[in-house]
Structure formats: C-alpha cells, structure tokens
C-alpha cells in the first residue's frame, strides 16, 4: 500500500509520468510531501530500505542533511560519488525546506520495522545535529554550522523552527516512531524544546 501511494502520487502529476519514473530524479518537494505519507507496510519492503540507504548516503558528517534532495532516486555512479563527497561539506546541513526533520522521521520508521542498527545510528546522529545546532537563546539557525550570513539567523520562516520543536516533542514524549530512543536522548530533547519555547 505504501508503494502504491507513492506510485499514485507520481501518476497524478500533470506530467502523467509512467509508474516507474518515481525512481528518476524529481523536484525535491516530491520527497518531503511523500515521505510522511508512507504507511507502515511500506517500511517492510526492500524499496523502503533502498530509499533509506539513500537517506544515509546523503547524511553529512554533522548528522544533518542538505536540502532539496529527492531521496527515492536511483543514483547514477556520478551522483553516488558526488553524494559521498558532499558528506564532508558541513556548510550544507540545514533545517530549511523540511530537510533533516524529514529524514530523521523516515529513518526512525524504517528502524522500527527492520531493527537494523544503521538506521538507528542515522536517527541518533540526526537528533544530535539538531541539539548541537540550537543557540543558547533557544533558537535554531537555518544552516549549521555556517560562519556568517543570513543562514545563521534564527529561522522562523517556513515553520523550520516549529518543525524541529514538534519533532523534539515527539521524541521526548516517545511517540511513534521514536519509541526506541534512550532516556538520555529524550531528556536532551525535552531540554532543547523548553529552551525553544523561551526563545
């Protein structure tokens, strides 16, 4: 059913693409719209893990993700190598355009189903990124780490900070799919959420 939802979404686009075209590069917005709509059955499929491995590939050494990536695409060798190289470009990690929060949730749902440690590790690294990126005053910059520019300003636009705080609340309340997280992470998430409220 989850895979059917993905195919149906693509098929109803104005371009009337073939069902298999969802594995080709699409506008990044397709990913952030589709990812939250997958049902639990989808995460039992090999396709879910293929996409999950792409998500891990694009995760940067900061623990965060760059924005505007269509994760379901089947990558060419050149795209794969470019993604590997970009892992160390720490200036691209962001919470803008639903980046990082979308990937954390996807990997958490995938881990719940597969129990594969690599997906759990991806989730934990992503959460640590959010915690490290928070300013002392409780806000989050659009990009972290970046030394200067508008990227380092607290990001209220596009609901970026709100999405982060909603995710942190789900984490410390241990709501699905975050039921597996250790208590120390939940405590850190609660503290970060409370700081965000005060910002």
Ranges and model annotations:
Residues 18-26, 59-88, 132-152, 199:
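Glycine- and aromatic-rich loop/turn segments at beta-sheet edges
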Residues 1-18:
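Bacterial Sec-dependent N-terminal signal peptides
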Residues 154-196:
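Aromatic- and glycine-enriched pocket-lining scaffold segments that form the walls
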Residues 30-43, 51, 56, 101-116, ...:
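Well-ordered alpha-helical scaffold segments within catalytic/enzyme domains
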Residues 83-114, 129:
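Long, hydrophobic/aromatic-enriched structural stretches that serve as scaffold segments
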Residues 51-63, 122-139, 188-199:
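Long, well-ordered core segments of solenoidal/helical folds
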Residues 17-25, 36-44, 85-100, 148-161:
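Solvent-exposed loop and edge beta-strand segments that line ligand/cofactor-binding
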């Amino acid at each position: 059913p989850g895979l059917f939802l993905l195919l149906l979404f693509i098929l109803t686009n104005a371009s009337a693409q073939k069902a298999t075209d969802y594995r080709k590069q699409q506008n990044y917005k397709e990913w952030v719209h589709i990812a939250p709509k997958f049902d639990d059955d989808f995460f039992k499929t090999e396709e879910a893990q293929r996409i999950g491995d792409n998500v891990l590939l694009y995760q940067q050494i900061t623990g965060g993700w760059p924005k505007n990536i269509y994760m379901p695409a089947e990558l060419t060798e050149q795209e794969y190598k470019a993604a590997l190289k970009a892992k160390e470009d720490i200036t691209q990690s962001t919470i803008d355009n639903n980046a990082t929060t979308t990937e954390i949730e996807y990997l958490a749902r995938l881990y719940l189903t597969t129990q594969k440690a690599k997906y759990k590790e991806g989730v934990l690294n992503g959460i640590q990124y959010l915690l490290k990126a928070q300013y002392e005053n409780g806000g989050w910059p659009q990009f972290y780490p970046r030394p200067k520019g508008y990227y380092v300003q607290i990001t209220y636009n596009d609901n970026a900070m709100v999405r982060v705080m909603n995710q942190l609340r789900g984490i410390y309340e241990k709501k699905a799919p975050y039921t597996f997280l250790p208590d120390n992470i939940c405590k850190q998430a609660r503290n970060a959420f409370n700081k965000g409220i005060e910002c």
